[in-house]
């Protein structure tokens, strides 16, 4: 890494003093929050050079072009893929995309910005005036859902409101395309600089300061993550640095705002907002003033890092090496047509006829990239073979509980190994490759048609996940024969053994004193056969054996 002594002084040029404000304390001030969200785009190359994007495990300073390092004579060349992804985000967020957009230089001096300026968009951003809708299921925790739904069902209640009315629209002021900076790491008196991240493509999404609770701010970020993953613009991961969030907090509509930088997750976003609000209220309550500042957050409290610079300090100027970009209506239509079905529409489809997925499962399918499309295909294949309502409920159970559950357990195991080796393994999954939808539908139908019991199907599913070659080459019928999973003749031996071991129970069933006790006998046979045999088959065989006693 590049090494810079901490003794080196890097001083920002201050040309304007921010005015402080004092607030009346007769009533508790309103919390006002705005968000600035930086999201890395899923491109193969950097924003203004042909360098391929690095991974988390890439050796420091090995993915750096001459332009990334700001060597004299190098010039930027826009990556069109980054522009298209930024347009997808802007359209999905219902923004007005500008016909003309341009790049500016934002000047400041810092070790991880070798050019002395960042290429961003200040005067002519890519898009403005968007919005993101937060529905009731976005705004309320799952623990609150039962009470909300019960209240909604109680039409006699005077204060009952349609759940749809609980949604809010968060305005988006602008979306701009810009380059990322390098990464600084501090060790004692030295600063280590890794330029791999320099010139990575970002979009900055700026909301209006209209959010009034910390939980709503976190809900906005979660919803945005889901949307960007759904349309293939970004992974939205905090862990890998693909998303970084700054929050602006003030008290009262005219309050001076303080910016909290680079919060690492949604829990920290909530906690930092609440801590900063309490700090400002306490400060004003003691007769102090809130000054425009950049804040840090240590997990419990916020603290002042530096006085906030005004925009004039950055000395914005048009980038003379990048031309204006003119976007045609045809280009925007093509981008719009390339968008997949957006999360809110997918949710509405999942919870309606013929799927009737629960709210909880619908959100799981939406939040996990690629999983809702996978579910739809499994459902369609099952529904082609049967209209049985019970069978049609099985695809969501298998996709959410069995497939996703086992994939997540495998991820946790790999993450633990990666933590030990220092090489994190992050990223989305291709569920079609892990377990093809046709194969899962075949397994579900085998249970429905009594070829397999549910425990046997789960065992077979687990085997196929661990042995992809068997999954690829073996049919369900072959697997039933190979692993002796069918309703084989050993049911006779198992039934006879259970009857001999539980004579008193058998007697109570036969004489009619306790006919329900046959369920106990069925359970014992299922235990003896490891759940491989259908309970109905076991019951028939038990009754046959008892008749011949």
From Swiss-Prot:
Alphabetic keyword roster: ATP-binding, Ligase, Mitochondrion, Nucleotide-binding, Protein biosynthesis, Transit peptide
InterPro entries: Asn/Gln-tRNA_amidoTrfase_suB/E (IPR017959), Asn/Gln-tRNA_Trfase_suB/E_cat (IPR006075), Asn/Gln_amidotransferase (IPR018027), Asn/Gln_tRNA_amidoTrase-B-like (IPR003789), GatB (IPR004413), GatB_Yqey_C_2 (IPR023168), Gln-tRNA_amidoTrfase_suB_CS (IPR017958), Gln_synth/guanido_kin_cat_dom (IPR014746)
Known catalytic reactions: L-glutamyl-tRNA(Gln) + L-glutamine + ATP + H2O = L-glutaminyl-tRNA(Gln) + L-glutamate + ADP + phosphate + H(+)
SMART domains according to UniProt: GatB_Yqey
Main localisation: mitochondrion
Cystine crosslinks: none
Catalytic activity, EC: 6.3.5.-
Annotated Pfam families: GatB_N, GatB_Yqey
Transit peptide: 1-23
GO biological process: glutaminyl-tRNAGln biosynthesis via transamidation; mitochondrial translation
Source taxon at top rank: Eukaryota
Keyword Mitochondrion: yes
GO molecular function: ATP binding; glutaminyl-tRNA synthase (glutamine-hydrolyzing) activity
Keyword Transferase: no
SUPFAM superfamilies to which the protein is assigned, alphabetical: GatB/YqeY motif, Glutamine synthetase/guanido kinase
Localization annotation: Mitochondrion
Gene Ontology, cellular component aspect: glutamyl-tRNA(Gln) amidotransferase complex; mitochondrion
Role according to the record: Allows the formation of correctly charged Gln-tRNA(Gln) through the transamidation of misacylated Glu-tRNA(Gln) in the mitochondria. The reaction takes place in the presence of glutamine and ATP through an activated gamma-phospho-Glu-tRNA(Gln).
Family: Belongs to the GatB/GatE family. GatB subfamily.
Assembly and oligomerization: Subunit of the heterotrimeric GatFAB amidotransferase (AdT) complex, composed of A, B and F subunits.
Protein name: Glutamyl-tRNA(Gln) amidotransferase subunit B, mitochondrial
Organism of derivation: Yarrowia lipolytica (strain CLIB 122 / E 150)
Organismal lineage: Eukaryota, Fungi, Dikarya, Ascomycota, Saccharomycotina
